[in-house]
């Protein structure tokens, strides 16, 4: 799926921001965006982190997708101007550069956003996830709807393994994992906490 936009399902970013602010200043954060697509979601995550934690946060985002083409687009961070028209003026100025001349009508995310992100290819269904350290937060939004029940369960078990106890999992608006209460506790609309 490549349907994506900046700050889609905005309540997630409000909850994420409050979660980031809940720890002492300077505490390190490790976050995984497991369906990076063309980059709007990972950049929204990093913008939220910069707003919540200040300009040089101890923050690292791993952004993955199965599709290397969309990852290349994400890593470039270049978008049509109309794709950010829903953002506040403050966010547009703080996080984007406007194209000039032949690049008029385009915007590019500022380099400090990209510096906080590692883009890598990961197939959620395969068991060879490359992660060494567990994450504080995982975004796995609007992917599971494409998997059957047993596959969803396997992926959730793996996410449980790579998420710290008490870590947060954000899922898509159409996704419900109430049958996985042994792994996750519902903490808000489509927000779960790892048991």
PLM regions with names:
Residues 51-57:
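Short helix-capping segments at alpha-helix termini
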Residues 137, 177-195:
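Core SAM-dependent methyltransferase catalytic element
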Residues 27-44, 59-62:
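Conserved class I S-adenosyl-L-methionine
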Residues 17-20, 43-50, 160:
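A structural alpha-helix within SAM-dependent methyltransferase catalytic domains
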Residues 165-173:
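Conserved beta-strand signature within the Rossmann-like core of class I S-adenosyl-L-methionine
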Residues 1-32, 172:
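Conserved AdoMet
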Residues 34, 57-139, 143-153, 176-178:
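Extended basic-aromatic, gly/pro-enriched interface segments that bind polyanionic ligands
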Residues 153-165:
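A short glycine-rich, Lys/Arg-flanked "PGG" loop and its adjoining helix->strand segment in the class I
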